[in-house]
Amino acid sequence: MDPERAGPDTSSEPLPGAGSAAPSSYVGEDRAAGRYAVARRHRWLLGPAVLLLAVVVLRAFFVTPFGIPSESMQETLLVGDRLLVSRTTPPDQVQRGDIVVFDASEAFNLDVPQRGVLQRLVEAVESLAGKGQPTDYVKRVIGLPGDHVRCCAVDGRLEINGVAVTEPYLAAGARPSSTPFDVIVPPDRFWMMGDNRGASADSRAHLGEPGGGMVPGSDIIGKVWVRYWPLDRLGSVDQGQIASVPRNGE
């Protein structure tokens, strides 16, 4: 028999396992490594997401930052001061003399321009850093619902429900108001004034308009709680409570 034809030629056949897929243990390790990498990326994303959510919740329900943009509350609050405003004080617990931040768009009949989605998003991000909306004002509560407030009494002081009151937060020698007024605050409304009476566009500036410059309780964002900037003025803000006066008509 021809030795060259004795059997099939196997010299070109691959060895067992040659060219086959990698062992299953290697595949499992690769998959595990991939899952670990994905989980790690998710953790990196989850942390900032949770932090952002916490900030949003705190700002919406507890405290919100606010920067002082004007001189209307000098000398109590200066331009550039940064505050934390407590949102936990309901309107019926607001007292005379409290410093509050409120949305003045309704009370002061402000023209609010239409804003697109992108602009609203930018404003939302800026608000987290303490930049308020153009319609957010900070003033001192002078008249509560039902109060009779007028300026000025015979001795030149502000008068609430027939009682001339001392305002320790005004600068020395400052007049309570160069604009005379005599108002009765409606239910669920507040009469607001800035401490820098000569440079404050407050309730007095809107006497002849619909609503008479009275701020609805529902528009009060919160009560000023603490100043966190600048550091040399860090601390609580003196609310300068007005002395107790009787209710109107008592």
Regions found by a protein language model. Name each.
Residues D2-H42, F61-G67, E75, V79-E250:
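Soluble "head" domains of membrane/secretory-pathway proteins
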